[in-house]
Amino acid sequence: NLRSDELTKENIIQRLRSFAQKAFRRAPVAGELEPVQKLVSQKINDGMAPLEALKLGFQSILCSPGFLYLNLGEGELNEYALASRLSYFLWSSPPDDTLLNLARIGSLRAGLSSQVKRMLSDSRSDRFVRHFVRSWLDLDNIGSMPPSQDFLVYYRDNLESAMRDETETFFRHVLDNNLPPREFLDANYSFLNRELALHYGIQGVEGNKLRRVSLSGSSRGGLLGHGAFLTASANGVDTSPVVRGIYVLEKILGYTPPPPPPDVPAVEPDIRNATTI
């Protein structure tokens, strides 16, 4: 709703600086906006409407390295770099006004704990949960290794997304309630919907929405019993304790075992019942 007749020279400069701070995720350094301001002034002098010239200035800012590249510098992060690191880590998006204002006055580092709590309570932190869990446990591999035809009858179309959602919701629950790390292994509950519960052989769960379900007396508790965990650590056809064991070592214990000695031959596949074309 902004009109050209409302834009004075001072107002244009102020709007450019405000826009640049959000685009660059920091305050513009001395002289950084001079080329943009000169461009806008030149276009206005050439007869372009101030509003159109301002839009051109915005476009120029969005084409600059300060916007296109996330350059946090070397060494200890300054306040603006800390705001960007925090925001992209927890929200996968640029810092909001609160973070930028705290960075501007130099108070972000002192209030870091309260800002982390604020950001984790925001729905945008669901992006962190999704990206972190999928990267940690390779959950994006689910679907690239479908089960063999013999088992497709047990593998419904929406199970893949439900499996991911179970693990992500479980991680979110542990995070929100500040539970100890052992909860990932010995929890006696999970978050299931009807399809996933039926796949696990659990009765009495209705609807598509995930809800907390007690698993007392079951071996399903914890990440090791999640369908997503078991699917991501398999190839969809064969059971391989070695492959799954390496997956557990790397993802849970943070240890990558060395390769087998060169004099240990590969295990030949069982082809006793195989046929040829």
Can you annotate each of these PLM segments?
Residues N1-I277:
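Active-site substrate-binding loop specific to GH73 endo-beta-N-acetylglucosaminidase modules
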